[in-house]
């Protein structure tokens, strides 16, 4: 198994696909997706285009759908939800499909949607993602960070490092043996330095600071936790993620 890290969707190769692709948007799309499914949501369907989201979701009964839209960190007008995982309570999402479009995370998922196995990872469900990789042993794994509008992000990189670090710790393989590119080595180093203060790292990240200015302090606290949700969001059909059954 070789892990490759791409800091933004635009950096992924266009002439091939991996056996397994993992989209990461710690702040906050993949954290929200994991939370919705852990709270009993039927599925999460992702869109890059808001108009397309509205068109598709209109075909669902009102009581069976929720619309989540975020642009620039703020909720899209007319949608029930923005991109805060803390809003996704079991009382709200149980049995419903979440139709979601965000600034960055949904683009990452759409970029890798043709891979045989597509997962959504965040710090909060890291262990479930790692267990899938250890069980399935895919030959090539792409971890694709969402970044922020095409730029590198600390929070997605440290999550990739958390995944790679856990695989390193649970196998007899060295970091050099599991790393397919230098980005993985640097991500492991970042996680190793900050693993005991991930909230502090998120506070230093540019998108973390952006969310703090929007008074999303509790979101950062929640998203900085590791392994609190035993849920694996996996693509069942193009653009539709459901919880992997145990």
UniProtKB/Swiss-Prot annotation:
The keyword Lipid biosynthesis does not apply. One of its GO terms (molecular function) is 2-phosphosulfolactate phosphatase activity. Disulfide bonds: none annotated. It comes from the Bacteria. Keywords: Hydrolase, Magnesium. InterPro entries: ComB-like (IPR005238), ComB-like_sf (IPR036702). Pfam families: 2-ph_phosp. Gene3D superfamilies: ComB-like. Its cofactor is Mg(2+). The keyword Magnesium applies. NCBIfam families: PRK00886.1-5 (NF002056). Belongs to the ComB family. This is Probable 2-phosphosulfolactate phosphatase. The gene is comB.
């Amino acid at each position: 198994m070789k892990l490759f890290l791409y800091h933004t969707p635009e950096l992924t190769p266009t002439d091939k696909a991996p056996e397994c692709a993992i989209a990461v948007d710690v702040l906050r799309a993949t954290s929200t997706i994991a939370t919705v499914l852990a709270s009993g949501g039927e599925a999460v369907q992702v869109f890059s285009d808001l108009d397309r989201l509205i068109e598709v979701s209109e075909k669902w009964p009102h009581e069976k759908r929720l619309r989540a839209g975020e642009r620039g960190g703020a909720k899209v007008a007319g949608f029930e939800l923005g991109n805060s995982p803390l809003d996704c309570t079991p009382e709200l999402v149980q049995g419903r499909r979440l139709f979601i479009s965000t600034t960055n995370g949904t683009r990452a998922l759409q970029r890798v949607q043709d891979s045989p196995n597509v997962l959504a990872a965040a710090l909060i469900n890291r262990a479930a993602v790692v267990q899938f990789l250890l069980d399935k042993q895919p030959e090539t794994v792409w971890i694709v960070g969402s970044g922020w509008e095409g730029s590198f992000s600390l929070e997605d990189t440290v999550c990739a490092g958390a995944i790679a670090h856990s695989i390193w710790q649970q196998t007899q393989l060295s970091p050099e043996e599991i790393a397919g590119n230098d980005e993985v080595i640097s991500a492991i180093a970042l996680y190793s330095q900050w693993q005991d203060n991930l909230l502090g790292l998120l506070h230093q990240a540019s998108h973390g600071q952006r969310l703090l200015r929007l008074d999303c302090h509790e979101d950062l606290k929640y998203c900085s936790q590791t392994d609190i949700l035993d849920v694996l969001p996996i693509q069942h059909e193009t653009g539709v993620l459901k919880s992997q059954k145990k």
